[in-house]
A protein has these predicted regions:
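Short, Lys/Arg-rich, polar N-terminal cytosolic tail immediately upstream
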Residues: 1-7
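Non-catalytic, solvent-exposed segments at the cell envelope interface
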Residues: 105-115, 121-123, 129-488
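Cytoplasmic membrane-interface regions of multi-pass membrane proteins
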Residues: 64-73
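Internal/C-terminal transmembrane anchor helices
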Residues: 73-96
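Hydrophobic alpha-helical transmembrane segments in integral membrane proteins
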Residues: 90-109
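Membrane-interface helix-boundary signature
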Residues: 8-19, 72-75
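Membrane-embedded alpha-helical segments of integral membrane proteins
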Residues: 14-65
Length: 488
């Protein structure tokens, strides 16, 4: 006999249909989520198994009530509600996983680097834009590198300046300083160096009228073959002194070797001063400042430090000013205790000696770069940088920070950090950290030297301030790294 359609039956049929739809949505989402959990093993087993078991049990419960005869309307309604709720929760989890996967894709090593070339004019110049420059005098120098000549050709396609060529960079800089030319065309990184070492040239007294950017093809730096959850390893943190695109060539002002032993949960931060005198890898003759190694690419910094300390560096992490500010702001700030009192008005940052202070990203960067207030400026700046790094590591390795600020942290770093650490190694480390939540013991060290002034490989016609190597300090640093990595 055909069932008579009643309002009650009609309602039940509608609820049953909606329940089927909600069940299908839940099942599809749950299956996809399970596959993602297997493919990207971020969650430890103690979290992974309960989640999978819960998803299966819920699926069986929904099946039971969907196909059970004479299921009450309120049961169908309850199934719909719970199916949609759990589908939404899984979708929320997808959101986190999507951020994670996207982040690790975005920080892979670049196969190019960006070089910038400036047209610099005095601050009081009447020229306000590059279109006005035609027929004005432009100082250049005899740099026969392909990149400089390419940048100059790109510039002369936009304007027709009266080019005055000088034998070296010093001559070109002096020309614009003395008013013999209206501007100078110089590689951006060299302009910053010249500003530091030439008494008569301060880049703050000049305006960048135009920037020519070149994208140069380079070979990506290969990563080491280690399991970072089991094997000890070294990471070079290279902090470049610029904002914007992380691929931009610049000096490496922060050079910290992070030695990690996952078996003992110990970390050693070994800092090499930016002005440390080193033999750039593959060069002979004049030595150079370590900071200048960054001008020749991250691989030069890595290989030069490996030569200096006699160690292997498996990975690198390249950051810039934007990285520091964004990360610390995403963490909600950090706490440090300055050992000097000073004020920097640019970011309205007050520092008080002996007082534990909460710093946002801008003030943390200011603190990390400060040297003028200290008697031993560059050496003391190393201590400040290690203070910042230790505070960041401590905050990153607390469960509360990871859980509450996870997506903000990833978003803040996605376009301002570069590393050759493979994605699967990150997944393993996150898995281990969530599983064990270990407390990491952080130690510090820095190589030492003696202040001298000598010509360098990059600027051979001027005596620059450098730290002459202290062999005993280098041996000590090398031994400390080796011993920490060897601990069981």
């Amino acid at each position: 006999m055909q069932e008579i359609e009643t309002p009650k039956n009609h309602t039940r049929n509608i609820l049953r249909a909606f329940s089927y739809v909600a069940f299908c949505i839940y099942t599809i989402v749950a299956v996809i989520f399970s596959v993602v959990l297997v493919k990207f093993p971020i969650l430890p087993l103690k979290f992974f198994l309960p989640i999978i078991i819960l998803l299966v049990i819920l699926d069986l419960i929904f099946i039971f009530f969907l196909f059970k005869k004479n299921t009450k309307n309120y049961v169908y309604l309850s199934c719909i509600i719970f199916e949609l709720i759990f589908s939404a929760l899984i979708g929320f989890a997808f959101y986190y996983f999507g951020h994670t996967i996207s982040f690790f894709d975005s920080i892979k090593p670049h196969d190019y680097q960006i070089e910038e070339y400036y047209v610099l004019v005095p601050e009081d110049s009447a020229l306000t834009e590059i279109g006005e420059f035609s027929n004005h005098t432009l100082a250049t120098y005899d740099d026969y590198s392909e990149n400089y000549q390419t940048a100059l050709r790109d510039l002369t396609q936009k304007i027709t300046p009266q080019i005055v060529s000088y034998e070296n960079l010093s001559g070109a800089i002096n020309a614009v300083v003395d008013g013999n030319t209206d501007a100078v065309f110089v590689k951006g990184t060299l302009a910053e160096i010249v500003s530091d070492v030439f008494e008569n040239f301060d880049i703050d007294n000049y305006r960048i009228l135009d920037i020519i950017k070149l994208q140069i093809k380079v070979d990506a730096v290969e990563s080491g073959d280690v399991d970072i959850t089991k094997d000890s390893f070294n990471i070079l943190i290279s902090g470049i002194d610029t904002y914007g695109d992380i691929a931009t060539v610049s000096r490496s002002d922060v050079n910290i070797i992070v030695s990690v032993n996952p078996r003992t949960h110990k970390v050693l931060l070994t800092t090499v001063p930016r002005d440390y005198e080193v033999q750039l890898h593959g060069t002979t003759g004049l030595m150079d400042k370590l900071t200048h190694a960054g001008l020749y690419g991250i691989n030069m910094s890595i290989q030069t430090i490996e030569d200096l300390l006699g160690i292997d560096i498996s990975y690198y992490l390249r950051i810039n000013f934007d990285s520091t500010i964004k990360l610390i702001d995403a963490l909600g700030g950090i706490e440090v205790t300055p050992d000097a009192t000073f004020y920097r008005p640019k970011y309205n940052c007050h520092f008080r000696e002996g007082v534990t202070m909460h710093l946002d990203g801008s003030c943390a960067l200011t603190y990390a770069r400060e040297r003028k207030v200290y008697e031993f400026g560059d050496l003391h700046r190393i201590q400040n940088q290690q203070d910042i790094l230790s505070a960041v590591i401590n905050k990153l390795t607390t469960s509360k920070t990871l859980l509450t600020n996870y997506t903000n942290i990833l978003t803040s770093l996605s376009d301002s950090i570069e590393t050759n650490i493979p994605s699967d190694q990150f997944y393993r480390f996150i898995n281990m950290q969530l599983d064990q939540m270990p407390s990491w013991n952080i130690e510090r060290n820095a190589v030492e030297g003696t202040e001298i002034h000598v010509p360098t490989y990059t600027i051979p016609d001027r005596a620059l301030f450098v730290f002459e190597q202290n062999p005993d300090s280098i041996i000590k640093a090398s031994v400390m790294i080796s011993e920490l990595l060897a601990e069981k």
